Amino acid sequence: MKKILVVAVLLMLVVSIGAMGQQTLATVLERGKVIVGVNAVLPGFGALDTATGEYTGFDVDYGKAIAAAIGVDTEFIPLTAGERLTALQTGQIDVLLRNTTWTLTRDSKDLGLDFCPTTFYDGQGFIVRKADDINSIADMDGATVCVTSGTTTEGNLADAFRLHDLALITQVFADTEASFGAYDVAGCDCYTSDKSQLASLRTTAAIPGDHIILPDTISKEPLGPLVRHGDDEWFDIVKWTVFATFFAEEYGITQANAATFDSTNPEIRRFLGLEGGMGAKLGLAEDWAVNVISAVGNYGEIYERHLGPNGLDIPRAGSLNALWTQGGLIYCPAWR
């Protein structure tokens, strides 16, 4: 009898968690805003403009895109690397857009999270001072490396030094500001993170020109949005919002022309909401994708605005972040 009672309680708990997982869209619509977890100190991806009080960046724009798809406002919550996953798990935020790497562990049933399509393909690297004459990882035997806790970079760093049979001394800090700050005042020989983050943080150094990013890439770091596991409706909305920005770039639909774009191409017409009932399949208005592009632009426009020559100046041509038609991995499934 006792065993039956325990099983019954466990089943009720599973059902309860499943029911909670299915209500994100309804909650967002009721409150009139989507709550997005972001980085507040990473220019180009997520940063707070102290002059305006507004968040800006590549990840921030994807939060705005999700809100535009639904027709609600946004609220941005700044999170450290250590806080981000818990904030999503506990329902503090609706979606996490904070330069977070897709890994098996993070995507497993243990954490209860799901990754949406990758928005930026990255890799871990190193930033060093020019004066130290370090040209590659091979020159770092016995180096002291600053790293942020709660990230994939800790494990990748240990693996890379072990693979190259190098001695390693690490200094681990709770957040990016502290870890990069320690490096910037010569508290360690180098700092390691995703290369996009290194490019961003270099702009915040006391003397940016004193630092170089080494050519070594020691990992694959696919970055993109995360949602809670079990809410398929919300997962689909976030997933296809990302795909909408990919599709729009491929077909020349921009922030400036989205509202008036016309075509005889059946797939484009489905995208624009002119036929096919695609919006209803997601529980959204038929012109939801038009609203997304009108709000933030297509993938290329978002990239150019924050990561292009006037932003972090991370080359896109020939990279994995180019469209699939140009040799990259930015690719939208069939819009049908």
Model-derived segments and spans:
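Sec-exported extracytoplasmic/periplasmic mature domains
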Residues: 29-30, 67-75, 89-93, 101, ...
